[in-house]
């Protein structure tokens, strides 16, 4: 005993361990919800489940869905008990609630430790940021411009893509392999810069900065989350994402100031212009509140769009039976509509179906519609959620549910095209369409507003690649296995593909 009392390190360790166990016990009971538990039970069991959550998350959600698909269940995670809502009526009940009841931003903020890594998604500072509806309107404005044949926006978008593709994908005749994810990530970044920052697309150092930032956010966010609140500012100081964020804020703020100096009555040409004008028209917001929102949009646009692009290319490379029908559709679309334009891209319905099936078969997140209860909430069936509870819907399991998607365990690249033909409801099965049975882009109040721009980017990239090149995995091997982390599924970031130029095909596909 004398040794213990004379050793401050041992005393400190005992106090820390006792404090941790006490906090864990409080968290265990405070976040408890009266629904079935999936995984280990009890205080000790839930603690073990929390430790193993990184590896067991997707399996737990699948198991819980199979046993409780008509109600709900809870799983033990580092955030406490998280509740998965499987019942369709209950999902409809919570998905459209206002943020003062169920907040999507609070989940994003905590997941990525946005206070330090992604200020444009910081829940604690939401009152200072340009509101979400304004952000959605700016993206809708871009969507309308893309659909307007008289607006040069989409033609310039295509030119940006063609330049970026030529710079990043330098294909040799022998089809030498190259890493798929980093190359296509830079192409997606160039397109995103074009839409959000216009002329800055021509600055390679900005593309470098954005790609580095997009990679740093999840890594640093997950790392910072491991530490208690008192240590997070110190840990964040040594992380990369906060410094990269500051650099981006400086670059974009200086660009806005330069544009203002050149022309105070500038007509908006990109999302940054639109947001800057919104700040002018709405006193009480500073320009930085718009800039950090734009930066947050970059992150959402680059990383997730690249992932689906890579998933799609890997599926095409290992499913040669789809190559001819997709190429025939692309060729017909280009001839009919006179080249690479919005009308041609929209007419590629089989390609759209293939991309959507690649997304279904490789769901980014096993969960969707993630919300945090910002106050105590009670469903109409009586289920009570204490303030702070995280809830989500079972996105991944639903996508393989045979009652929703017959032969769901099998890849069918024309699945959604055939459903559109059979039902004569093509809109219901497009890549961008969200529904209660397809939650890849969310649903309800917080359906992803950037999905239309993402769809344009992915379809353009995949169509161009397939039209001009034969695609194969390195050494003609099998499809590289996906990687999972907690609820998330990533394509193999190191996967290499081979592109071999096709023989001249005499069409309008320049």
Curated annotation (Swiss-Prot):
CDD domains named in the record: CYP503A1-like
Gene3D superfamilies from the UniProt entry: Cytochrome P450 (1.10.630.10)
Protein name as catalogued: Cytochrome P450 monooxygenase penQ
Organism: Penicillium crustosum (Blue mold fungus)
UniProt entry keywords in alphabetical sequence: Glycoprotein, Heme, Iron, Membrane, Metal-binding, Monooxygenase, Oxidoreductase, Transmembrane, Transmembrane helix
Pfam families to which the protein is assigned, alphabetical: p450
GO molecular function, one term: heme binding
Cellular component GO terms, alphabetical: membrane
Subcellular location: Membrane
PROSITE patterns: CYTOCHROME_P450
